[in-house]
C-alpha cells in the first residue's frame, strides 16, 4: 500500500483510541500519526502523543458521524513534500478534513467533525498545511494551540466554505509571521507566545515540554464545550480531563491546548539564542560556546526533516 498511519479506523463504531504514542510513520500517502478513514461513527482520538509522522497529525475523511481529535500533542508531524510540488494534495498537513469516501468522483460529507484542545509544535524545517475541503459537512475547530518555529518556509492554510458549516474559534497561532492564516481561522484567535514550558525550537520529544507556564495567555482562554451529560456526545461533553490528567470544567472556559493545569512558574531549562560553534580545521569536531553560561551542555542532532539522530554531552561535539 506504500503507506500506513500509526492507526486508523475504517467503518468502525464507538471507538476510543487513547494514551498511545504514534511515531515515525513514513510513506507517500496517509502516514499520519493516526487517521480517521471513512464510514465511522463515534470515534475519538484523545490523550495521544504524535511525533515525526511524515503525512501529518490529524486526517479525517468523509461519511463520518461524531468523529475527531481532542487533547493530543503533535510534534514535528507533516514533513512530507508533494512529489509534484502541488499545494493541497500530498504535502504534509497539521489538520486535514476531506469528504473522500472510497470512489471518485463520489463525495460524502460528514456530521459532527471535531478537532479541539490539541497542542501542535512545528519546527523551522517543516511547513505542513492546514486544509479543510469544500462540502465536508459541519466542522468544529476549537481551542487548538499551534506553535511554529520562527524561521523557515511559510505554513499555508486554506479553509473552504462551499457547502460547509464551519465553527472555528478560540485557537492560538504563534508565530503568525510564518503562518499564512486563512481569515476563517481568525475568529476569537490568540496570537501571543503561549509560553511553552520548554520552547526549544527543534522540538523536544517529551510531552511534558508542551505544558504552558502560569502566565501563558492560553490559560482560561478557550471556548467552553458543554451541554450534555452523555460522554459520547463529543461536541457537548469535553471529557472532563486533559492530556496530563488535569480536570476540565464543564462550566468554565478551558485553556487553549492539551494542557489544562494552572502551569508551573518557570521553564524546564535555560534558553539562550547566543550560541557559537567553532569548527576545527584539523579534526572532525566543533566547539560550542554559550554566552553567560558555564554549566553542562547537551546537544541533540536532527536531520533537516526533524528526525532525531543522536545526542552528545559536553562542549566538544564530534562530527564522526
Can you annotate each of these PLM segments?
Residues 1-208:
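Glycine- and acidic/polar-rich repeat regions and solenoidal domains
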Residues 126, 152, 231, 253-254, ...:
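Residue-level structural signal for beta-strand termini and adjacent loop
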Residues 131, 228-234, 291-293:
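Short loop/turn motifs at secondary-structure junctions and domain boundaries
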Residues 150, 177, 262, 305-307:
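Solvent-exposed strand-loop boundary residues in beta-sheet-rich modules
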Residues 208, 216-267:
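Surface beta-loop-beta hairpin patches that serve as ligand-binding interfaces in beta-rich domains
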Residues 268-320:
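C-terminal outer-membrane/trafficking sorting elements
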